UniProtKB/Swiss-Prot annotation:
Recorded name of the encoding gene: frr
Annotated InterPro entries: Ribosome_recyc_fac, Ribosome_recyc_fac_dom, RRF_sf
Principal subcellular localization: cytoplasm
Localization of this protein: Cytoplasm
This protein's record includes keyword Transferase: no
The protein's name: Ribosome-recycling factor
Pfam families listed in its UniProt record: RRF
Organism: Bartonella quintana (strain Toulouse) (Rochalimaea quintana)
Single annotated GO MF: ribosomal large subunit binding
Family (UniProt): Belongs to the RRF family.
Length: 186
């Protein structure tokens, strides 16, 4: 394993932590309608469990309304049940093969709960980033021990790894701040 591949791997894994964090935040309900709100939901279809977006189109016709167009008439009931039982507090209105889902206003208590959950997701992303940093530092120490890089090179690369970690955590904090203001905005 060479230095370049270690640094590329660290960058890729830290970017992955940010992507996973953003994906988790996408599932949090804010005051605004978003198709990503329903994407994690699963429904039993044709003998297996699949995501809703594999049996229907999800769109946002209005800022506080989601629309789900189910492709197979036999799946409408299952999709409606999945949305109703999701714990998101949504009540779909069935209209043939389409479901309209009005998003109710979030109360202050629920908003604070969502912010708390967002902070938990952010902490998970920070921890994942720190684990990646630790792996990178261990690899650099191993290369130094094996004599592939000098002590000075190892020190310089360690600083680069720390800088990359700091940038990634700052990015996570920035994304969290945007999501927090989105949730708390009435």
């Amino acid at each position: 394993m060479n230095v370049l591949s270690i640094m590329d791997d660290l960058k890729r894994r830290m970017d992955g932590a940010i992507s996973a964090f953003q994906h988790e935040l996408g599932g949090l309900r804010t005051g605004r309608a978003s198709a990503s709100l329903l994407e994690p939901l699963t429904v039993e279809a044709y003998g297996s469990v699949v995501h809703i977006n594999q049996v229907a189109n999800i769109s946002v016709p209005e800022p506080r309304m989601l629309s789900v167009s189910v492709w197979d008439k036999t799946m409408v009931g299952a999709v409606e049940r999945a949305i109703r039982d999701s714990g998101l507090g949504l009540n779909p209105i069935t209209d043939g093969m389409n479901l309209r889902i009005p998003l109710p206003e979030l109360n202050e208590e629920r908003r604070k709960e969502l912010v708390k959950i967002a902070h938990q997701y952010a902490e998970q992303a920070r921890v994942a980033t720190r684990h990646v940093r630790r792996d990178g530092m261990d690899n650099l120490k191993k290369l130094e021990k094996e004599g592939e890089i000098s002590q000075d090179e190892a020190h310089g690369l360690s600083e680069k790894v720390q800088k990359l970690t700091d940038e990634t955590i700052a990015n996570i904090d920035k994304i969290l701040a945007v999501k927090e203001s989105e949730i708390m905005h009435v």
